[in-house]
Curated annotation (Swiss-Prot):
Region: Disordered, residue numbers: 1-27, 185-399, 873-909
Species of provenance: Mus musculus (Mouse)
List of catalytic residues: H847, D926, C979 (nucleophile)
UniProt-recorded name of the protein: Sentrin-specific protease 7
GO molecular function, one term: SUMO-specific endopeptidase activity
Bias-annotated ranges (Basic and acidic residues): 301-321, 328-341, 880-890
Length: 1037
């Protein structure tokens, strides 16, 4: 063949070398390298064929040359119509593996896609990469059988692949993952399947190899992806064959011995085209299934919608010239849409594994004879796509193919109807395959080929409700054979679509019982009582009659489960199941029992008592409640949601005589160890819970012990007795009057007031007033008593009480004067301006706090020399203040040194008297700081101002300057109920450790420990009870 003809310009992408006539010279190699360097931005090497050597390569050593045309600038040549004026010739090209060059190594490190698509020698699978180019790149090659006698050189053919994603326009679609999985096949015909693409152009690569492995290079494509594409789209390729080599469109049936089962591998050959009209709609890109995201390995057959719509390998007749590119693109798009409705089974698909590096594939020779009838049946029936197709699904992070091992699936469908039997050879790793062409919804229904023992295949439904996925035909078992040594049978992956859920099963519970009581009837068991949501079945026997009573749960009113803890009856059962039936259901009960002893007029027939063999377990009790809850929900009877207690059930039948109800006659009477006739006494006993009886059970028990002929007796609390809180429900009783008579103004404390001393309760005003009086009279020193006055807890409430204006005598009075008139009688016997400390308990919004008016007779702060006793107290407060300041001051070094100097000077000058500050102020001691302090202080200032006018007959202004308000830091409460307790403790601590120096600031954080508050309630309770006993003794004397 001529290298080039005159008048024809050689394409830049064509690399032509002669076979045995002329070896590639260094100059040619330099040209090749230069061409590759120019296209460095668009080159993507993905072929691992460089490692396919020797007899394992599908390239026959007898063939010395191979031709490939990579023309990116001739769209018509790429479409199958050669340029006019050019002579017809056969080109031969030596494929170069870019992975061995520096440029290839660079791309191998940077590009994310590292796998290559390998094909069997008899078929080239071309999947369209997600392209961002407007051009549609299609490559179609056929190898001429005329060159089958030529021998290829020793060098292994290599393929240069171009990835359009590396262009400037394609980079913005890099986020779309590529979906290119190839299939291995040893069929004799060429088939090209195309994935749905999201780009404006479709990438197709086609190769056709005959059974003699002869090759013919041509530019015309032959799209055979769908059966809807007319034959005219492949006409140009057929005409080119006829012109160049005279090859007829009919291809001879392959001979089994000519097949090389070990040859695998083919890379994509991509060609660019400038046709911008050939495009898919963008909406199709949104539904493109991304197979690379499927990491799961499984085994399954193919759904009809999962199979690509690829035409069968039938003889194609050459008709006419190919239409324009836009027409071809439209037909391809229509065929892609129809592929989800009427799929045809793809032939000769084989699973393969893709690796970032080239992977060695070792083939296992299989000399099986073809099965013509099986293959022809698969080719003729579109309903057997599950048996004749397999899809490849490869995870980019998993390595499937192992070096030296391979998986081969051979299928053939020759025109004459002859075929060969498909054979599957497995590798050391499970091979995951999926369809090469999937619809927009199939990514949710990933079907996977399952590897298991020979002649067995199983499917698993994943993400779909179609029952056809769980069905396997006999043809699938015949077409796929898997060795069992590497992949044993796994029953865990079987189809579980027919498993019935546990929720559909009814709840059922059985009890072993000893007796059943229905009205006057007592029966012995003949089995277990069964509880379900629909019925309750009770098998029993009365005399010689065996009865199986079935109670409809819709007629059940209440149920009860009672257990007795009485040790006296330990020989008997301690569990009773109680069923209360509807009165209109008694006729059906009588019909089932066939006993004239039952009377519909008797209320006792509504009750069924089941004496259980033993106490039921907690699990059985919970299940019984679940069944009753289901019955309650089903029938709308809310009473069945909880069991009926014995106390509520006893009044239902306690008025019945033992002759009417056998339960009272047999079980209840014997359990009480009383005569049968004593019906009135029997009703006072209970099986499980104490009834409303006058008999009081002792709360103690005797323990007897014999030792050395002597008996010892001890009394302890009954272990069965439960401690309950005792609440006095009787009349209110006055416990104490404090101070007791003959002192006037005594305050009475009742038993109701004592209850507020329980933990978590709020203290009422009676307890507050009682303890304040007690502190003033019993705890305070005589000096403090003379200098102090305590108002009642009602004082501030009366002072701030709102009254109707009509009740006021003089409407011209100010607000402060009106308030003072309400409490003017509270100080008629005392002058508060002669006191140093006036305590005012305040309650606002159920919160107690204390207000202390200090030195109301002073108009400004006064400093006095304190006596020796007060000086020691003052020094303690000062040291406490210094310690607090040391903790709060960040400059601790200077503060500590200053305190040390002060202490030294104090020790030296002990004889020097200290000054004590008396400041008129209002102290607010609040354990929660939740009150409106400013309003309280202002109300007290206004009261003092009016009281001063009344007592001193002069006017004096109590303002913020001469009567300041102070809020010292005091111990705080840690709950929401101890505010009253803290108020009492503030007053008690004030009397025990009074504030002698009012120099600011005043720190009282460590005024008293916290544990004092924890026991304060109990201390007050004991005090009241102690006073109660004292006053009772005094009254009795």
């Amino acid at each position: 063949m001529d290298r080039a003809r005159p008048g024809r310009r050689r394409a830049s992408s064509e690399i032509v070398t002669e076979g045995k006539r002329k070896k590639s010279s260094p100059a040619d190699l330099q040209k090749i390298t230069k061409l590759l360097t120019v296209k460095s931005e668009d080159v993507l090497a993905q072929s691992p064929l460089s490692k396919l050597r020797g007899s394992e390569c599908w390239w026959t050593r007898s063939l010395r040359n191979k031709v490939i045309c990579l023309d990116h600038k001739k769209p018509k040549a790429a479409r199958g119509c050669p340029p006019k004026g050019l002579p017809k010739r056969h080109l031969r090209v030596m494929l170069t593996n870019v992975l061995w060059t520096d440029l290839g190594r660079e791309f191998r490190k940077t590009l994310p896609r590292k796998d290559a698509n390998l094909c069997a020698p008899s078929k080239v699978q071309s999947d369209s990469l997600p392209s961002t180019s407007v051009d549609s790149i299609e490559t179609c090659q056929r190898l001429d059988p005329l060159h089958q006698s030529l021998n290829l050189s020793e060098r292994t053919p290599r393929v240069i692949l171009t990835d359009i994603r590396q262009t400037e326009l394609g980079r913005k679609y890099l986020k779309i993952p590529p979906v290119t999985e190839a299939s291995l096949s040893d069929t004799a015909n060429l088939k090209s399947e195309q994935l749905s693409s999201s780009s404006d152009g479709s990438l197709e690569s086609c190769q056709s190899v005959n059974h003699h492995k002869s090759f013919l290079s041509e530019s015309g494509p032959k799209p055979s992806r769908t059966g809807d594409v007319p034959a005219k789209e492949a006409a140009c390729g057929g005409q080119k064959q006829g012109d160049d080599g005279g090859v007829t469109p009919e291809m001879a049936a392959p001979h089994p011995k000519d097949f090389n089962t070990g040859n695998k591998g083919c890379d994509y050959l991509e060609e660019g085209t400038s046709n911008k009209n050939t495009s898919y709609s963008y909406s199709e890109m949104d539904h493109t299934p991304v197979s690379r995201k499927r990491k799961k390995r499984g085994r399954s057959n193919f759904h009809d919608s999962h199979n690509s719509k690829t035409s069968l390998d039938k003889p194609t007749e050459h008709t006419k010239e190919e239409e324009n590119d836009s027409s071809v693109s439209r037909k391809l798009e229509e065929s892609g849409e129809d592929s989800h409705q009427d799929p045809a089974p793809p032939e000769g698909l084989a699973p393969e594994s893709l690796e970032s590096e080239a992977t060695n594939l070792r083939s296992f020779a299989a000399g099986q004879e073809p099965d013509a009838s099986a293959a022809s049946g698969r080719a003729s029936s579109p309903n057997k796509s599950l048996e004749s197709s397999a899809s490849s699904e490869v995870s980019e992070n998993s390595s499937v193919a192992v070096k030296g091992e391979a998986l081969t699936l051979k299928e053939a469908s020759p025109p004459g109807g002859s075929s060969e039997e498909s054979q599957l050879l497995i590798s050391a790793e499970p091979i995951v395959v999926s369809s090469d062409e999937e619809g927009p919804v199939e990514h949710k229904n990933s079907v996977i080929l399952k590897l298991q023992p020979p002649h067995e295949i199983m499917s698993e439904n994943q993400g779909t409700s179609d029952p056809q996925l769980s069905e396997l035909t006999l043809g699938a078992c015949e077409s796929v054979q898997v060795t069992s040594e590497l992949f044993p049978y796994n029953p865990d992956v079987e189809n579980i679509s027919c498993i019935k859920s546990n929720s559909e099963m009814d709840l059922k519970l059985d009890f072993i019982f000893t007796c059943v009581y229905i009205g006057k009837i007592k029966g012995t068991p003949k089995g277990c009582v069964t509880f379900t949501k629909k019925y309750i079945k009770i098998p029993f026997q009365v005399s010689t009659n065996e009865i199986s009573l079935t109670v409809d749960t819709a007629r059940l009113k209440r149920f009860g489960l009672w257990e007795s803890k009485d040790e006296d009856h330990s020989k008997r059962s301690h569990a009773i199941l109680f069923l209360w039936l509807s009165s209109d259901y008694l006729q059906d009960i009588q019909t089932q029992l066939e006993n004239p002893m039952l009377s519909q007029q008797s209320k006792a027939n509504e009750f069924i008592f089941l004496e259980l063999n033993s106490s039921i377990s907690q699990r059985e009790e919970l299940k019984l409640k679940d069944i009753m809850m289901e019955i309650s929900t089903k029938n709308g009877n809310l009473h069945l949601s909880c069991p009926l207690p014995w106390v509520q059930a006893l009044p239902l039948f306690q008025d019945l005589s033992p002759q009417e109800i056998s339960f009272l006659h047999y079980y209840y009477a014997s359990a009480s160890a009383l005569p049968t006739a004593a019906g009135a006494d029997m009703k006072k006993k209970s099986v499980s819970q104490p009834s409303n009886s006058d008999t009081i059970k002792p709360t103690y028990t005797f323990l007897h012990k014999q030792s050395s002929g002597c008996y010892s007796l001890s009394i302890t609390s009954s272990p069965e007795e439960e401690w309950q809180e005792v609440r006095n429900t009787g009349p209110v009783q006055k416990l104490i009057v404090y101070p007791p008579p003959p002192t006037k103004g005594g305050l009475g404390v009742t038993n109701e007031d004592l209850e507020c001393l329980e933990e978590g309760e709020f203290l009422n005003d009676v307890i507050i007033d009682f303890y304040l009086k007690y502190l003033l009279l019993e705890k305070a020193s005589d000096e403090l008593v003379e200098r102090s006055h305590i108002f009642s807890s009602f004082f501030y409430k009366c002072l701030t009480r709102k009254e109707n204006n009509l009740t006021e005598d003089n409407p011209d009075l100010s607000v402060a004067q009106r308030r003072h008139r309400r409490v003017r009688t509270w100080t008629r016997h005392i002058n508060i301006f002669n006191k140093d400390y006036i305590f005012v308990p305040v309650n606002e919004s159920s919160h107690w706090y204390l207000a202390v008016i200090c030195f109301p007779w002073l108009e400004e702060a006064v400093y006095e020399d304190c006596p020796q006793t007060v000086s020691q107290q003052f020094q303690g407060q000062q040291s406490q203040h210094d310690h607090k300041m040391t903790d709060n001051d960040p400059h601790t070094t200077s503060t500590v040194s200053t305190s040390a100097e002060d202490s030294q000077s104090t020790e030296v000058n002990m004889s020097v008297p200290k000054k004590m500050c008396k400041r008129p102020c209002i102290l607010i001691l609040d354990s929660l700081k939740a009150a409106s302090i400013q309003n309280t202080v202002q109300n007290l200032r206004e009261y003092l101002e009016v009281e001063w006018e009344v007592k001193r007959k002069t006017h004096r202004e109590f303002s913020k300057t001469n009567m300041v308000d102070l809020c010292p830091k005091v111990p705080k409460q840690d709950n929401s109920s101890d505010c009253g307790v803290y108020l009492l403790q503030y007053v008690e601590s004030f009397f025990q450790d009074p504030i002698v120096n009012f120099e600011l600031p005043i720190h009282l954080e460590k005024w008293f420990p916290r544990h004092v508050i924890k026991t304060k309630r109990e201390d007050i309770r004991e005090l009241i009870l102690k006073l109660h006993l004292q006053q009772q003794k005094g009254g009795s004397c």
